[in-house]
Structure formats: C-alpha cells, structure tokens
C-alpha cells in the first residue's frame, strides 16, 4: 500500500503546475511598496498641510490607511488586491485592517456582540498576541543591553 501511495504522489508531482515564486515575490514587493509609498505621501501631506512633524504625522497616516483599507474591504476591492499581491497587501497595517473588517462584515448578520465582536479578532488576535510578545522580548533584550553597557 505504501508503494502505491508513493507512486501516486510521484505521478501527481509530475503533472502539478509549479507555483511562480519569483513572480509572486515581485507582485508582493511592488504592491507592498505602493502601499508604503501611499503612506509616505499621506504623511508628507499631513506634514505640509496640517503642520504636523514627522513624529506626530505617523498616527493620522496609519489611521487614514486603516480607513481606506476598511472601505476598500467593504466594497470588495481589497480582496482582489490581496488575490493579486498576496503578502504584499497582507503585511502592512492595511492587511491587519482588512482582516478585521472582512471578519466584521462576514459575521454582521449574527449581531454586534455574538457576531462582529466575537469573530472580528479570530484572525487578528494572533497578530496582536505575537506582536505584544515580540515587543516584550525585544524590550527585555534592549533593557538588558542598556544595563550591560552602562
């Protein structure tokens, strides 16, 4: 039986199309770079027209990108961008907003508490947990280095 399974797997492998890894990386790089360029343009806009500095313009820039991402998710456009770009649209803050907005839209028929609030953090919760843990670890390493160097 094992020989038959191995033979089947080898035959399937010969006919299975190879994923275009290089092209997928190029698309992710270009779309992710475009999202970051839009973010930089928004930050420059806030600095120039609203008298922010580089440090204070970050929060309204992120909020604007999140709002745009949530709107594009609601209109079904961000899903098409994600299908084309893959990780290029999932890694920036817009991907996090997309995951929360799409879950909220999917479960809105079940009500605000049991539908939206319960299911909104299913995918995004992992990102939050690992982000907090990584920030804690990096903070402890930095604290240790500062104590050792002083």
Swiss-Prot record:
Residue stretches spanning the membrane: 30-50, 57-77, 84-104, 121-141
Cellular-component GO terms for this entry: plasma membrane
Gene of this entry: spoVAC
The keyword tRNA-binding is assigned to this record: no
Keywords: Cell membrane, Membrane, Sporulation, Transmembrane, Transmembrane helix
Compartments where located: Cell membrane
Source domain of life: Bacteria
InterPro entries associated with the record: Spore_V_AC, SpoVA
Membrane disposition: Multi-pass membrane protein
Name of the protein in question: Stage V sporulation protein AC
Any GO BP annotation: sporulation resulting in formation of a cellular spore
